[in-house]
A protein has these predicted regions:
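Solvent-exposed interhelical
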Residues: 49-81, 170-208
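Transmembrane alpha-helical segments that form the membrane-embedded catalytic/substrate-channel core
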Residues: 47-59, 106-118, 140, 165-181, ...
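Glycine/small-residue-rich hydrophobic helix-like segments
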Residues: 190-239
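Interhelical loop and helix-boundary elements at the membrane-water interface
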Residues: 2-18, 61-79, 114-136, 190, ...
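Helix-coil boundary and interhelical linker segments in multi-pass alpha-helical membrane proteins
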Residues: 24-44, 88-100, 140-163, 214-225, ...
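Hydrophobic alpha-helical transmembrane segments of membrane proteins
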Residues: 10-17, 24-26, 30, 43, ...
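Intramembrane alpha-helical segments
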Residues: 73-149, 238-239
């Protein structure tokens, strides 16, 4: 049992779970826009997500991150190194537009952690805009990036899916902001710090209503996607309702984070069963 728990803990801390959640959102994009699933894109994004999030998590320990003796951190380093090799190899199979857009998104990830001016502040320190930049990058990675490999794109519907994804990610991120209240410096001025937990939850509920409203605009009109989006909005609302500052260890990092996986499974089930 201890071994299973150790593997599960590594699965969470190494960003593997998060990477599968990101892939779920990409597959949802393909399904929503009736595009063929590109497994090379999924492979690239999976490896890039593991590397990026492990870098973000442990960047505060730089340069000591590369010389740590902690076994669990070393395992994460090895995983990131292997993913890095896979990512470099896979880049050679992408087209120029996809590579260019990938570097554009990588730039945001880089300045999220690395200071970009003399004040030694990075995007992570600008908390009033941080959550929106995170949502922009997530929405771009899971909507625009997969479409760069296609020649025929419905730009209106793609933009609506991007907008819906952006709204969803902001709401989806707020439980993590609430969880981190006891760790974040008051100077960060996160949404829960500025408006309180109750008001933060109200903001999330409003965003989820907007998320559902956008569903009715996206074409073609599909009962499967509407039901799926309604149910996932309800599930996310329930998770937000249950979110509190002092929560169980894996509530946010596993259960809340798993919402995109549930969303994908729900979508596949509804597509296969709805006439």
């Amino acid at each position: 049992m201890k071994k299973i728990f150790s593997i599960f803990d590594f699965y969470i801390k190494s960003s593997l779970h998060l990477s599968f959640c990101v892939l779920s959102l990409i597959v949802i994009t393909y399904l929503r826009l009736d595009q063929e699933i590109n497994f090379l894109i999924l492979f690239v994004v999976f490896n890039a997500t593991v590397i990026t999030y492990n870098f973000i998590k442990y960047a505060s320990t730089l340069p000591y991150y590369f010389f740590v003796s902690n076994i669990s951190i070393k395992k994460i380093q090895y995983l990131s190194f292997v993913c890095g090799i896979f990512l470099i190899i896979s880049i050679f199979f992408l087209n120029f537009n996809t590579i260019l857009f990938g570097f554009f998104l990588s730039f945001f990830c880089f300045i999220y952690v690395i200071p970009f001016n003399r004040t030694k502040r990075n995007i992570r320190n600008y908390s009033r805009i941080k959550i929106f930049i995170v949502a922009f990058v997530w929405a771009s990675v899971t909507v625009w990036f997969p479409l760069t490999i296609n020649n025929e794109i419905d730009y209106l519907n793609s933009f609506l899916v991007f907008l819906q994804r952006f709204v969803f990610v902001v709401a989806y991120t707020l439980p993590f902001e609430i969880r981190d209240l006891k760790y974040d410096s008051i100077k960060l001025e996160t949404i829960p710090q500025l408006y309180g937990i109750i008001s933060t939850k109200k903001i999330a509920y409003f965003l989820l209503i907007l998320f559902v409203a956008i569903t009715f605009i996206i074409q073609p009109f599909s009962i499967s996607f509407i039901i799926g989006d309604l149910l996932i909005a309800l599930l996310t609302s329930l998770m937000i309702l249950k979110t509190k500052e002092n929560q169980k260890k894996y509530f946010a990092s596993f259960w809340v984070e798993s919402i995109p996986l549930v969303w994908l499974l729900l979508m596949v089930f509804l597509i296969l069963t709805t006439f």
